[in-house]
């Protein structure tokens, strides 16, 4: 899951720290030392993590947008200036903005707040923000809890005794409470020094950034793998005394199911499954990063020559169009499948079902599934016209199906521009034009974005007025027809806003080629 590091650069972070030796340190230097340690660990063991760096005092600034380049993040740590007073609320508002712009409100995110425990002074201080928390309007609400799933880790460049001498610790604990209790406060044990700062950040790494290694098994075949992001324990709400359930480190494949049968099931989370190659001495050579490029290339070459069950499984699932059912724990299952990342690249993914003996109703109980060879006759029928499962979903979804994503403005802009490009090439691109138009129409109706339909209709009418004299007469009719259909759908009338309805091309008698026109 993405990480936002929020660094306090107010004047209080420049307070000197008495450290053994002649060199003078500030609390800011201790924080930079700890973050450098964190970034080095993530570059080696958590390199798929997207991380952003935000600095704040009375205002906030995005120093490094979300990236996997940890060298850039470490360079930014040495380029931070000192500013004025602390205002935590503005920093938390900044975190809300950058996370929602990049990832939306559904992706879990970890926020690492590095500060010295000073709450600021006057209006804008954390004391003032918490004191007025219950007196705010909805338009001026406090940024916690975050509008996305999150965990807030507060790294204090102060020891517990210093924080308890004021109300700083109570206010910081209130932040965790406001974030639905998701997070933790870390303080320096003992005097402020580099060693104790390393120990504090080491606790954060152990808690939140330890890679999840497991053994993937299928019969006698095994493979060491890393599951990313790390699966979080799941708490069953129905239990009287809920106990977090964690997945086993032994992931055993219990069978294979056709991808058409498993359809598009509800899942708790999705994870990459990455093989961990071992060299001849038994040491790991992947998926970490080595310092020397030549050593890295040679290690990858060695790893590429060693047979790996995880690679075999990935290729087999991709070719056969099947998924592997994997047991995560007692009465807890998931599935392994190949997901295309691009036309030439795909990844082995693992999705976690909800715990229980029957996570997918249309498959029945997992424990009662068996191989086709045990059946007296082909359960799918001789012509593949029936199913052995008790309940079939109405619509079977394909994992290769293109999904309309408008998380960023650029995604919506691209889809609209695609329609306009095809509109200028009518009637040759009639089929493509209506295909893209219906895709945008369905997405707009699904999101309740009716104003978009009105806006695209206006654009099509404008394109109609800009057609050159040499344009085919059918183009004007098709553009006018499409614009009218979108305007009708934008009114919200039920008979015109059916999701399954498609706008069909207008039937005309115009010839389609220049030869026919002559």
From Swiss-Prot:
Subcellular location as annotated: Nucleus
InterPro entries the record matches: INTS14 (IPR039841), IntS14_b-barrel (IPR045814), IntS14_C (IPR046471), VWF_A (IPR002035), vWFA_dom_sf (IPR036465)
Gene3D superfamilies attached to this UniProt entry: von Willebrand factor, type A domain
Gene Ontology biological process terms, A to Z: RNA polymerase II transcription initiation surveillance; snRNA 3'-end processing
UniProt KW keywords: Magnesium, Metal-binding, Nucleus
Disordered: annotated segments: 373-394
Gene Ontology cellular-component annotations: INTAC complex; integrator complex
SUPFAM superfamilies reported for this sequence: vWA-like
Basic and acidic residues: bias regions: 374-386
Amino-acid positions noted as binding Mg(2+) in the UniProt annotation, renumbered to this chain: 10, 12, 86
Ranges where the VWFA domain occurs: 2-204
Superkingdom, natural source: Eukaryota
Subunit-structure text: Component of the Integrator complex, composed of core subunits INTS1, INTS2, INTS3, INTS4, INTS5, INTS6, INTS7, INTS8, INTS9/RC74, INTS10, INTS11/CPSF3L, INTS12, INTS13, INTS14 and INTS15. The core complex associates with protein phosphatase 2A subunits PPP2CA and PPP2R1A, to form the Integrator-PP2A (INTAC) complex. INTS14 is part of the tail subcomplex, composed of INTS10, INTS13, INTS14 and INTS15.
PANTHER family reported in the protein's UniProt record: INTEGRATOR COMPLEX SUBUNIT 14, PTHR13532
Family: Belongs to the Integrator subunit 14 family.
Job description of the protein: Component of the integrator complex, a multiprotein complex that terminates RNA polymerase II (Pol II) transcription in the promoter-proximal region of genes.
Protein's recorded name: Integrator complex subunit 14
Upper taxonomic lineage: Eukaryota, Metazoa, Chordata, Craniata, Vertebrata
């Amino acid at each position: 899951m993405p990480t936002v590091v929020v660094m306090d650069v107010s004047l209080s972070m420049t307070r000197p720290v008495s450290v053994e030796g002649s060199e003078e340190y500030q609390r800011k230097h201790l924080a930079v030392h700890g973050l450098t340690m964190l970034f080095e660990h993530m570059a080696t063991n958590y390199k798929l993590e997207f991380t952003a760096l935000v600095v704040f005092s009375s205002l906030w600034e995005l120093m490094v947008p979300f990236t996997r380049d940890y060298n850039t993040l470490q360079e930014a740590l040495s380029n931070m200036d000192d500013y004025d007073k602390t205002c935590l609320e503005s920093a938390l508002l900044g975190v809300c903005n950058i996370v929602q712009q990049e990832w939306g409100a559904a992706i879990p995110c970890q926020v690492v707040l590095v500060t010295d425990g000073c709450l600021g002074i006057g209006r804008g201080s954390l004391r003032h923000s918490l004191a007025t928390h219950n007196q705010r309007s909805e338009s001026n609400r406090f940024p916690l809890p975050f509008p996305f799933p999150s965990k807030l880790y507060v790294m204090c460049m102060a020891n517990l005794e210093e924080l308890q001498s004021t109300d700083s610790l109570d206010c910081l604990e209130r932040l965790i409470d406001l974030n639905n209790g998701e997070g933790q406060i870390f303080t320096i044990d003992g005097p402020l020094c580099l060693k104790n700062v390393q120990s504090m950040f080491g606790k954060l790494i152990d808690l939140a950034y330890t890679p999840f290694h497991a053994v993937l098994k299928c019969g006698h075949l095994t493979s060491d793998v890393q599951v990313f992001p790390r699966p979080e324990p799941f708490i069953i709400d129905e239990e009287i005394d809920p106990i977090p359930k964690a997945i086993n480190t032994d992931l055993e494949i219990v069978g294979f199911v056709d991808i058409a049968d498993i359809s598009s099931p509800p899942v708790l989370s999705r994870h990459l499954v990455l093989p961990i190659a071992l060299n001849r001495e038994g040491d790991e050579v992947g998926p970490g990063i080595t310092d020397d490029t030549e050593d890295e290339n040679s290690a990858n070459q060695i790893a590429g020559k060693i047979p790996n069950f995880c690679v075999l499984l990935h290729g087999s699932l991709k070719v056969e169009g099947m998924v592997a059912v994997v047991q995560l724990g007692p009465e807890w299952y998931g599935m392994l499948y190949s997901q295309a990342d691009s036309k030439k690249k795909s990844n082995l993914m693992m999705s976690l079902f909800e715990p229980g003996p029957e996570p997918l109703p249309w498959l029945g109980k997992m424990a009662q599934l068996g191989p086709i060879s045990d059946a007296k006759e082909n359960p799918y029928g001789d012509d593949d016209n029936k199913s052995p499962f008790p309940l079939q979903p109405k619509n079977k979804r394909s994992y290769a199906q293109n999904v309309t994503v408008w998380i960023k403005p650029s995604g919506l802009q691209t889809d609209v521009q695609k329609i306009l490009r095809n509109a200028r090439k009518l009637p040759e691109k009639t089929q493509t034009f209506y295909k893209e138009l219906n895709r945008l129409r369905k997405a707009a109706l699904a999101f309740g974005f009716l104003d978009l339909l009105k806006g695209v209709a206006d654009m099509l009418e404008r394109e109609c007025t800009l057609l050159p004299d040499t344009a085919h007469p059918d183009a004007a009719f098709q553009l006018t027809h499409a614009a009218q259909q979108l305007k009708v759908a934008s009114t919200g009338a039920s008979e015109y806003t059916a999701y399954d309805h498609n706008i069909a091309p207008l039937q005309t008698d115009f010839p389609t080629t220049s030869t026919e026109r002559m």
